[in-house]
Amino acid sequence: MTDHFDANVSRQIRLETEFWDNDPFERPGSDSLENILNKGVEASIFAEIIGQFAVQLAAAKNIVEVSGGQGWASCIVKRIYPAAHVTLTDAVPSAIAGHGIWERVFNCALDQAFAAPAQSISLPDGTVDLVFCYAAAHHFVDHEAALAEARRILKPGGWCLWLYEPTSSRLLHRAAEARVNRKRPDVHEHVLIPSVVLGQARAAGFNGTVRYWPSTLRRGRVESLYYLGLSFFPALCSILPCTAHFALQRER
């Protein structure tokens, strides 16, 4: 564990803190209907995704979510796997403060929740079976440090799952990032290059694979047609922009 972050990581944490402290729908104490309805749609996507990793999750006794925000995804995992010890982490304390909302919604109780960035998690070495994040790894900035920290806390053979991440081939990466940042100019978004992520994972001590997932869930009309086309021509997923999951297993 380290408390010395890359300057870009520190900047990212400041931006995220500003969001969680001030957003009218998600700041501490807001308990807004808009937030519950929005996350409810995300929850349906997440529930379908974790079904694809049921083997890894069912075998895990100690599960940690990184960059989990208010923890609704952790609560779903706890509800489906009640015997597992589920820990929620996020870099921003005011994000973690909202996890009680989702414990009520999903009728569960998380075992642990504390503020920690993905690059510095205050847990002992080799004590976790599975680390996951949902649509968050592309915000990590320093992916090497996040992977190194995941490896540190994982047991040999443990899993690190980066789920529902935007990806693109190196060839189209610049265009893909420009597109997503036109959609949300207020928050700079990154697009992951699978070959780069897998190379970083190998260097950190993982064996990894990427699973492309051209789902049409929660897409606009044009995006739905695009992802439907990718589902018919899966070979294009490794070239064109596509959502994907990274399944990384720590070497024994």
Residue ranges and their predicted role:
Residues 144-156:
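A short glycine-rich, Lys/Arg-flanked "PGG" loop and its adjoining helix->strand segment in the class I
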Residues 69-120:
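Class I SAM-dependent methyltransferase SAM/SAH-binding core
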Residues 1-57, 59-69, 159-183:
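Conserved class I S-adenosyl-L-methionine
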